[in-house]
Amino acid sequence: MSEFFHISVLLRECLDGLDIKPDGIYVDGTLGGAGHSSQIAKRLTTGRLIGIDRDPIALKAAGERLKPFENNVTLVHSNFCEIAQVLQDLNVSGVDGILLDLGVSSPQLDDAARGFSYMMDAPLDMRMNSQDTLDAYQVVNTWSQEELRRILYTYGEERYAPQIAAAICRRRAEKPIETTLQLVDVIRSAMPPAALREKQHPAKRSFQAIRIAVNDELGSVEKVMRDAIPLLNPGGRLAIITFHSLEDRIVKLGMAEAAKGCTCPPSFPVCVCGKKPKVKLISRKPIVASDEELEANPRSRSAKLRVCEKL
């Protein structure tokens, strides 16, 4: 279990946001090291926790941590975006809370062999699920220059995307780019000296972009925003932690759309559109880490929690 130790971000805020009932049914769609889940399970008596993770290593570690609660816990190896299918397979028609902690976890970042980190040398991989076929090596060495430019700009918000994409294509024409530090070297070579002196690591945005592409992270968030709310019982809550603006935008817009009621013009004497809000927002603004948490866990700095409740 020590191989997958992960400090849970916004733990107290998530538990408050989910408003856990001892007899409720809850889903942790991004189980990880079960930091959030172990605290949810601790609060259940006759309730049930369904834990989902696409990473088999995380799932195994979570199983160990959740052993004291095994009578109340069901673990499933799947992607959180398949939550509707998972619940259907388990004959669960509705749940009282869904928690998603998006992005890559600390153990995945810290395990050099996984290829997520630009600080340690490893084969280009970046798969959250090692059984998936697409990896970072394929993206870097086989995708077209235009495809690379697009993901670097769109997913990494990298201003030097055209230069980096061109540099990758030039280097791989000589020989394949096989490791993380080889890729870092290519990225550095494409950036002007001023950019290399910035506080942020020059490869951070590019690595984020490639990781998002490999794991279809934004597609998964878009799908779960369509599917999760209908799965909630009335009064059930959806709590989602994001770590970058692209994910947060999808979650923010998805919740705002679900919270919208009548869209008729103010001049209409009665509603003719028939639209009713599906949820209410628990907080208009995202919940962020406290100063104490930031000091204890600097990785929580970019975390944003949004919560809504099914009407």
List the predicted regions and their residue ranges.
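S-adenosyl-L-methionine-dependent methyltransferase catalytic core, i.e., the SAM/SAH-binding region
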Residues: M1-L311
